[in-house]
């Protein structure tokens, strides 16, 4: 039996895995990266819109800093995130942007003077300062106070992935693709690597290491309609679950992106709306201002997705053979802007829908027939233009994943996890656009460093016989799938699983339908034990891969559905129509799913409390819908009083915002990442003789005063 030894084993070759591999090589470790596909084909490349980091370079970004990025991230998560992790993230993100620039990422840059833009559906002129010429530009994204999303046109993930992959090659990281991880090797609650199948030859071997880091991405493919690549089936997270030790966090927290192309499901980046694109119904009306007067199309993703579906349910969706949808109008931006800044969107729309989204020519006025006369709140009807893109919400991102602590350590010692595969828990119950590729790189930096330090100190304490036993177990299972007498067809089971998840565990959830989904998923899981593969070869066999992966996917589907059924509240992307309020009194916690015994047919669910008394910002009104639509935590007022007292005391002592923040909620982070981020406007504040950052203390004070006055509810 073949066994390969190394110091650091990284499973997954996207942004998080590759960046972590660089951290390992920088410490002199023998590092191997295993990837299902050539690493430049990883799903990280599909990210279009940008990466959030509070640089505050551009006109519309002035005044931005870590505090505002932190506040947006916490509010976006619907107070479901780990606030210490959010602080680690926002502090490191500006450093990550500049590191990527030094590695060759061609960030779109500021050009001094006037530039045209579309803001809130109106054509405006933005004047960039002469002294900011050449600095990194940022665009608007949903759920943010400032324009914070740095970008390279609409191919940000692609350029980032190529730069990080090149840097990994520069450091001579051993990257091996077409490798499929089947199971983790573990003994006495410690992980020592993985059993791996070569997709081309079918050979099953072991990679034994001092430390293992999982970075295999999300689990979107358990749904039928998703923007995710075919490799995003969550098999890595499921393998962690199958150890019986590692746990999955917040699996019911599934994001549905508002603007997926109909019918293909390919993402139409949030940059379309960030740059000024609008959503229209079948009558051509811009309907989002009626639902979200402040943020409109740039409300958080979970909010926009719900509003689109609510509007469609009212009968205002455009008809198509693939179901009702609404329109995304970016022709309003002008052809020059679309072809320069949204060229990938244009290519995708033309290739997969036959639509030139820059075409503002009138196609028909027939769509305006029957427009209600008594609904001025939805705006004016408009003739259908040729360039409008058909879109509707589809599964997009996995907030849940393998539960880790802030250092990336899972419940299984020696196993780390980073990126979308992890529940680090930066995103809570809703992720902000632009925080995903940002998290992938930042987690690769922070967790990669902690992982490398672990590998430097750890020892391999497992004998060859135990490793060979893991190899044999996987070999026997492959033989069973190829030669058992079962009659079940893998594709029939997989397709029905996806349909159940789409139909009953989607944007809107309800107890009875979740119970129905759970029952059917259990039946499918039982059937998956009797799958027999028709193609009998071990090598180059996609049917075999689907067979062993489908059983893992069903375990994840059960975790998602069980978590959604038990969580009797609505929080972020988890919307229960039978429990419409966010309930901080009962549900300010994190769901943990485990599978301690292979004989189980359902996950074990437990909960991890989020401690209000350790939060920098206590749970409050998120800013969408009715103000009273949440049940406050009983300790909220006590924590608010503590926060206010601390701010007032430190302000009297002349402390700046960073010192105030540290007093409110200390967090651990490597010194090189925790160092202060300097911005151009910092020097201007100093030049005026003002107290650096003091204006943010007042802003925070105003916020907490409002909380104490009861302005967080009606």
Swiss-Prot record:
Its EC number is 1.3.5.1. Binds 1 FAD covalently per subunit. It catalyses: a quinone + succinate = fumarate + a quinol. It is a peripheral membrane protein. It is found in: Cell inner membrane. It holds the Pfam family Succ_DH_flav_C. GO terms for biological process: anaerobic respiration. FAD binds at residues 13-16, 42-44, 49-50, 420, 436-437. It is an enzyme of class 1 (oxidoreductase). Its main location: membrane. The modification Tele-8alpha-FAD histidine is found at residue 43. InterPro entries: FAD-dep_OxRdtase_2_FAD-bd, FAD/NAD-bd_sf, FRD_SDH_FAD_BS, Fum_R/Succ_DH_flav-like_C_sf, Fum_Rdtase/Succ_DH_flav-like_C, SdhA/FrdA/AprA, Succ_DH/fumarate_Rdtase_cat_sf. One of its GO terms (molecular function) is flavin adenine dinucleotide binding. Transmembrane segments: none annotated. Its cofactor is FAD. Keywords: Cell inner membrane, Cell membrane, Electron transport, FAD, Flavoprotein, Membrane, Oxidoreductase, Transport. The fumarate reductase enzyme complex is required for fumarate respiration. Part of an enzyme complex containing three subunits: a flavoprotein (frdA), an iron-sulfur protein (frdB), and diheme cytochrome b (frdC). This is Fumarate reductase flavoprotein subunit.
């Amino acid at each position: 039996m073949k066994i390969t030894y190394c110091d650091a084993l990284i499973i997954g070759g996207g942004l998080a895995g590759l960046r972590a591999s660089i951290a390992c090589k920088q410490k002199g470790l023998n590092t191997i990266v295993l990837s299902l596909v050539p690493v430049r084909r990883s799903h990280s490349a599909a990210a279009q819109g940008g990466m959030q980091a509070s640089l505050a370079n551009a006109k519309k970004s002035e005044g931005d800093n870590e505090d505002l990025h932190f506040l947006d991230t916490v509010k976006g998560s619907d107070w479901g995130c780990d606030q210490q992790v959010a602080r680690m993230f926002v502090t490191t993100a500006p450093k990550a942007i500049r590191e990527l620039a030094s590695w060759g990422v061609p960030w779109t840059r500021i050009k001094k003077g006037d530039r045209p833009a579309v803001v809130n559906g109106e054509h405006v002129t933005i004047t960039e300062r002469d002294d900011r010429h050449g600095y990194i530009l940022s665009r608007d994204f949903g759920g943010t106070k400032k324009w914070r999303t740095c970008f390279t046109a609409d191919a940000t993930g692609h350029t980032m992935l190529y730069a990080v992959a090149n840097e990994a090659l520069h450091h001579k990281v051993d990257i091996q693709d077409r490798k499929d991880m089947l199971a983790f090797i573990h003994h006495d609650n410690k992980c020592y690597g993985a059993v791996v199948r070569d997709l081309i030859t079918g050979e099953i071997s072991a990679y034994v290491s001092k430390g293992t880091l999982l970075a295999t991405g999300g689990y979107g493919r358990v749904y039928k309609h998703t923007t995710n690549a075919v490799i995003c089936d969550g098999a890595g997270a499921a393998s962690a679950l199958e150890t019986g030790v590692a746990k999955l966090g917040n699996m019911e927290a599934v994001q549905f992106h508002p603007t997926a192309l109909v019918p293909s499901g390919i993402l139409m980046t949030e940059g379309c709306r960030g740059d000024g694109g609008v959503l229209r119904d079948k009558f051509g009306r811009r309907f989002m201002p009626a639902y979200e007067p402040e943020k409109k199309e740039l409300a958080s993703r979970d909010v926009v997705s719900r509003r689109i579906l609510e509007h469609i349910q009212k009968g205002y969706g455009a008809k198509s053979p693939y179901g009702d949808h609404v329109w995304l109008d970016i022709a309003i931006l002008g052809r020059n802007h679309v072809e320069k800044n949204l060229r990938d969107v244009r290519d995708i729309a033309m290739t997969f829908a036959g639509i030139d989204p820059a075409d503002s020519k009138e196609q028909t006025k027939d769509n305006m027939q029957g427009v209600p006369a008594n609904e001025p709140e939805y705006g004016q009807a408009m003739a259908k233009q040729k360039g409008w893109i058909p879109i509707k919400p589809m599964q997009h991102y996995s907030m849940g994943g393998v539960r880790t602590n802030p250092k990336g350590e899972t419940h299984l010692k020696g196993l780390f996890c980073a990126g979308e595969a992890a529940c680090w828990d930066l995103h809570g119950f809703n992720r902000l656009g632009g925080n995903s590729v940002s998290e992938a790189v930042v987690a690769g930096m922070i967790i990669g460093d902690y992982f490398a330090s672990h590998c430097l100190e750890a020892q391999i304490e497992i004998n060859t016989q135990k490793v060979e036993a893991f190899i044999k177990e996987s070999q026997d299972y492959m033989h069973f799938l190829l030669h058992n007498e079962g009659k079940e067809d893998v594709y029939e089971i997989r397709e029905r699983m996806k349909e159940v998840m789409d139909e009953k565990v989607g944007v809107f959830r309800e107890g009875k339908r979740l119970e129905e989904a759970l029952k059917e998923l259990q039946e499918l899981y039982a059937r998956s034990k009797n799958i027999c593969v028709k193609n009998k070869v071990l090598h180059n066999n996609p049917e075999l891969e689907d067979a062993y992966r489908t059983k893992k996917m069903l375990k994840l589907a059960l975790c998602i559905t069980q978590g959604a059924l038990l969580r009797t509240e609505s929080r972020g992307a988890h919307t229960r129509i039978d429990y419409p309020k966010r309930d901080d009194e009962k549900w300010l916690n994190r769901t943990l799913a485990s599978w301690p015994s292979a004989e189980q047919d359902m996950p074990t669910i437990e909960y991890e409390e989020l401690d209000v008394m350790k939060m920098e910002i206590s749970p409050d009104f998120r800013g969408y819908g009715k103000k009273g639509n949440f049940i406050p935590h009983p300790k909220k007022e006590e924590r608010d009083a503590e926060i206010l007292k601390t701010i007032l005391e430190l302000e009297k002592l002349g402390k700046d915002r960073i010192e105030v923040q540290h007093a409110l909620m200390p967090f651990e982070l490597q010194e090189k990442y925790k160092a202060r981020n300097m911005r151009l406007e910092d020097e201007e504040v100093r030049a005026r003789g003002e107290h650096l950052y003091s204006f943010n203390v007042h802003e925070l004070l105003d916020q907490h005063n409002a909380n104490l006055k009861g302005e967080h509810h009606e």
